[in-house]
Amino acid sequence: MDVVLEVVDTFIADYAYAYFYPKRLAPYDFPSPSNTTDTSAKAFSTWIYKPATQFITLEPPEQAYMSSWDRDNPLRQALTLYLITWIFGLLVYFIVATLSYIFIFDKRTFEHPRFIKNQVRMEIIAANKAMPVMAIITAPFFLLEVQGYGKLYDTTEDGPGLWYDFFQFPLFLLFTDFCIYWAHRWLHHRLVYKYLHKLHHKWIMPTPFASHAFHPLDGFTQSLPYHIFPFIFPLQKMAYVALFVFVNLWSVMIHDGEYLTNNPVVNGAACHSLHHSRFEVNYGQFFTAFDRMGGTYRMPEQWMFERDMKMSEGRWKKEIEKVDELIEEIEGSDNRTYTDSAPIMKKTQ
């Protein structure tokens, strides 16, 4: 995350901190007004620029030396990392989910009997409520990494070797998928589900905007493996950034309702769609392996990959009977308001 922090510092944060929290220089440091230049501020600064990576060098602007909080100040780093986590997360969410919604998501889903009234708006509101809270909990992990407590490395020479530059990607996916599988199963425990995970299962027929529409502690629990990985295993800095972008893209993709392939290895959109409608199957994030080992794998049926078949009213009616049974069994009652203004089956507590 120090690479991202350096980019944000160079183009945004240096200017903001210089303006809102300028350095107060003693009068005797500058004997004449002509000497009170930005260059002089650099000369009197104790902060020395060190690139976060050898692959990118960004010369700091003069404003980098003009704040009482220089780039190494932990409070400044914590605040900036919090804002990066929140705002960058929102940007990725809105850009990717919007593109997926416009170009991929099948709008016939709106006609599904279990599509909630004003669902897209509700998903966006839920995501916007969750992200700033998640950012508060997540930022300390990024701060520890920036402070050098993790196992992030820059070049091949700094890491285990060239072989690991390639091996780190499947290792990251397998480790995080294993951890998320068990975290996800825990979130479905009857004592936990209604408090943390029920919100995300409100969306039986999710749209791409449902990807981050969850309780903040739910989102943090399932993202925790991503954050602890670089404290346990070495991870190259640029790979770290790429993987975090990827996991956010993947979260949107598995909620877009476009079932491209019935792959027995990959836990794609079809598998995750079954998780939303069948609740206690397909807990994995990337692969089906841990669901198979844990006895929770449900293979998508062939009709799900036939576009017209999966959008047919006959298929919908057949499916919602099972969905409603599961809602009653797991949640006790259904307080969702569907597009037809009321659930087909009324439930009692």
Swiss-Prot record:
Keyword rRNA processing tagged = no
* Pathway in which the depicted protein is active: Steroid metabolism; ergosterol biosynthesis
Regions crossing the membrane:
84-104, 124-144, 162-182, 227-247
UniProt KW keywords: Endoplasmic reticulum, Lipid biosynthesis, Lipid metabolism, Membrane, Oxidoreductase, Steroid biosynthesis, Steroid metabolism, Sterol biosynthesis, Sterol metabolism, Transmembrane, Transmembrane helix
Q: Which segment of this protein is annotated as the motif Histidine box-2?
A: 197-201
Topological relation to the membrane, as annotated: Multi-pass membrane protein
Q: Look up keyword Lipid metabolism and say if it applies.
A: yes
Any idea where this protein resides? Endoplasmic reticulum membrane
Q: What class of enzyme is it?
A: oxidoreductase
Which part of the chain is the Fatty acid hydroxylase domain? Answer: 170-296
Question: Which Gene Ontology molecular-function terms are recorded?
Answer: iron ion binding; oxidoreductase activity
Taxonomically, which superkingdom? Eukaryota
Free-text note on domains in this protein's UniProt record: The histidine box domains may contain the active site and/or be involved in metal ion binding.
- Give the function comment from the record: The third module or late pathway involves the ergosterol synthesis itself through consecutive reactions that mainly occur in the endoplasmic reticulum (ER) membrane. Firstly, the squalene synthase ERG9 catalyzes the condensation of 2 farnesyl pyrophosphate moieties to form squalene, which is the precursor of all steroids.
PANTHER family according to UniProt:
STEROL DESATURASE
Q: What is this protein called?
A: Delta(7)-sterol 5(6)-desaturase ERG3A
Encoding gene, per UniProt annotation: ERG3A
